[in-house]
């Protein structure tokens, strides 16, 4: 994988931590973070992520990840569109339209260049089966989008965005020079970039605004949804590491 110019790496370091909450009390996002943080920390110990950070991940494993993540993101965008169609609030619809554009930009900026460089073809993508655990994750989010209120749906999908920002940020801090010299450093650059962290912050703020004063029972349910998705994310890392030997 090609190494980007030095200024790209420095830019990613400057944006590190910008996705973090400002510590204001009483926000749903504070509670979500407390609920899922230990699961995200477990993710950082997954072999796939550790080997990507230190540069020892086998290329065929990264190739398989790129295919599965591409298939996942296509379904993720479809789920966002379902939420948009079900929402009656213009502000929420605008936010979702912006989020869809940002996710599509992630595909263009991160996925397509990597897949072209890896020689991944459309035929290869079409012939690849999604692992069962990843299918379960997609169906879980899709069910929430179809059946539950917008806040529950957005909370579920937020985990993926926030987890990537959190994991990339903390692993850059932990691995430092190893990531800088890793053939996979572009992945960490992408998910610590200003564009990505700004998009993630907007999502956190939207969830907080929708959860202005939920009762305790609903907050607990939202936390349960969020941490369930965090668990599915960890299953995802296991699936992409073991799925293509």
Language-model features and meaning:
Residues 37-42, 57-86, 155-165, 237:
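Alpha-helical bundle segments that constitute or directly flank the non-heme di-iron/ferroxidase center
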Residues 91-198, 227, 231:
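Active-site-proximal alpha-helical scaffolds that flank and shape metal-associated catalytic sites
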Residues 83-87, 145-148, 171-175, 210, ...:
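Secondary-structure edge/capping motif, primarily at the C-terminal ends of alpha-helices
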Residues 64-75, 98, 102, 221-228, ...:
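A non-catalytic, amphipathic alpha-helix used as a structural packing/dimerization or gating element
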Residues 193-226:
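Long amphipathic all-alpha helical oligomerization modules
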Residues 2, 9, 221-245:
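Acidic, carboxylate-rich catalytic segments that either coordinate divalent cations
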Residues 12-16, 33-57, 76, 204-213:
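Short alpha-helical hairpin
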Residues 19-24, 28-35:
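N-terminal regions that are enriched for targeting/export leaders
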């Amino acid at each position: 994988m090609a190494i980007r110019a030095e200024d790209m790496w420095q830019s990613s370091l400057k944006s590190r931590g910008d996705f973090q909450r400002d510590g204001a009390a009483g926000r749903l996002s504070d509670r979500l973070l407390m609920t899922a943080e230990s699961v995200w920390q477990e993710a950082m110990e997954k072999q796939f992520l550790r080997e990507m950070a230190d540069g020892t991940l086998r290329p065929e494993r990264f190739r398989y990840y790129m295919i599965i993540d591409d298939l996942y993101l296509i379904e993720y965008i479809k789920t966002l569109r379902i939420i948009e169609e079900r929402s009656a609030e213009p502000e929420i619809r605008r936010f979702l339209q912006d989020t869809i554009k940002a996710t599509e930009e992630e595909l263009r900026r991160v996925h397509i260049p990597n897949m072209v460089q890896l020689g991944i073809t459309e035929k290869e993508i079409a012939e690849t089966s999604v692992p069962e655990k990843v299918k379960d994750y997609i169906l879980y989010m899709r069910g929430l989008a179809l059946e539950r209120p917008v806040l529950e749906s957005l909370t579920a999908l937020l985990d993926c965005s926030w987890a990537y920002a959190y994991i990339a940020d903390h692993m850059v801090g932990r691995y430092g020079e190893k990531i800088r010299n890793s053939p996979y450093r572009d992945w960490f650059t992408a998910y610590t970039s200003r564009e990505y962290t700004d998009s993630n912050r907007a999502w956190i703020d939207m969830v907080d605004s929708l959860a202005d004063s939920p009762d305790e029972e609903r907050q607990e349910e939202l936390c349960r949804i969020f941490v369930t998705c965090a668990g599915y994310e960890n299953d995802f890392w296991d699936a992409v590491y073991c799925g293509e030997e």
